[in-house]
């Protein structure tokens, strides 16, 4: 092939001639001839940009006699007119064929099909590159992973994922990109060009293909099928990432801990766990996030938007992944199986959490009391016992809670009162009945509405070594009191604010709890939870049957636990003795029978610190 000299062709816009080479004014790279300079210009978006964008790339000292890529004269900052303007975006073109070619990016038209596999393309040059993959012509191979490409430009973009190079920086928000096409798409978001809107949820997109991908989250269409396991996906990129799992490919590896990842975005989010960086700030509550997906999910919680609806039961969800997981409840699909006990799970993280039960690993340790946890979320909840943080607030009454599940339970009291027309129930938190020697010591306990909305972890049914009586549970009744201290004699009696039954501070309480009636037997219950639990006792509401003995259960988990009695599988082994158990709850009960080593913090210590009560010293 004959190489053209710089005199035979003029440089592309944004370039100046330096001797016999062409220098890019955007990134200072140099090229020996005009064709290579023109190809590089496309990576900066100069091949099909408007006059205004081209002028921004041209420096004042650009040669006024320079010509653009098509051979047209460029005089100073003015270029040849572009009479063919796109009606959907600010781009303009010199010829009608160029405009028609550009219009396919808006319409999604792909008139060039591949004769081998049927895949279609918008431009003939894209088809030619694709055909090289069928012919096995992939001469450009990555040195870091087994991936190969038919074009050098594709390889260079791919290699930036390994090196972390992101040469395309947005002037408006500072975000940087490795792929010029992704950069151009991002620029449209600042221009506000989102002409394609979803008819179901109103979400708008800059390109038609993005709208098509989004619509599959509503329809449930998953046209991309994995040939290894049969799993289907709504996006081709998701299938590509999934196939790396079968090939054991993790091209993105963390230099700090050595952990590998199949996706660049997952690797970048992981890096922030080492640096502690949380760049995504919620403007409503000030909470910060390390990855954009968690941030978007959190924002939907504020907005209350749940655009993804189950077609079988009508339940709405914020994320398409949540809807896909919910559908498994209807289909009974539990694809994640434990290799040690054959237990199956709906979600992969449920399996990972369950695996810690067998391994006994508790890698997350509290710096205050030394207690260890299998999950980071459990440690986060536990740390609030020490800090007193209660981040979950009720919008109806202002009460705050340590964990979100307690807030949801509390909110049901407001919803049930609205359904029955009765005034909302107020929650009574009966304080822990401390040993007699501790009763009355220390400062007064805080009001129930501000302090002890939830029992701290590990404080249910604690025995008292000194003979005092401790409450076995936290109770909810239809009244509010300051604090209750149970004495050694007469657990049912409570001095102070709580007097005789039905009286609070000497005043009678005549509020009746709401009544919930069973449809089958007309029995009444004080809470909706008790009613639902009772309804499962009816035979017609116990749909899960044991095939060996015929016993029926109200949920699938109960049937799985029961089936182990037939198979003699006891997957939960005590780390202190050879005993094994059918369920994790039975194992936890058994572990309490083993003596606690001296020096191990007791579960009572965090509560004592929270209440501000002095610990008993030696007599």
From Swiss-Prot:
Pfam families: zf-C2H2 (PF00096), zf-C2H2_6 (PF13912). The modification N-acetylmethionine is found at residue 1. Signal peptide: none annotated. InterPro entries: Znf_C2H2_sf, Znf_C2H2_type. Residues 52-78 are annotated as: Disordered. One of its GO terms (molecular function) is DNA binding. One of its GO terms (biological process) is DNA repair. Its main location: nucleus. Keywords: Acetylation, DNA-binding, Isopeptide bond, Metal-binding, Nucleus, Phosphoprotein, Repeat, Transcription, Transcription regulation, Ubl conjugation, Zinc, Zinc-finger. The modification Phosphoserine is found at residues 10, 387. It comes from the Eukaryota. Residues 54-71 have a biased composition (Basic and acidic residues). It is found in: Nucleus. Transmembrane segments: none annotated. There is a cross-link at residues 57, 59, 65, 80, 154, 512 (Glycyl lysine isopeptide (Lys-Gly) (interchain with G-Cter in SUMO2)). A zinc finger (C2H2-type) spans 22-44, 84-106, 112-134, 140-162, 168-190, 196-218, 224-246, 252-274, 280-302, 308-330, 336-358, 364-386, 392-414, 516-538, 544-566, 572-594. Belongs to the krueppel C2H2-type zinc-finger protein family. May be involved in transcriptional regulation. May play a role in DNA repair process. PANTHER family: KRUEPPEL-LIKE TRANSCRIPTION FACTOR, KRUPPEL-LIKE FACTOR 15. This is Zinc finger protein 668. It comes from Bos taurus (Bovine).
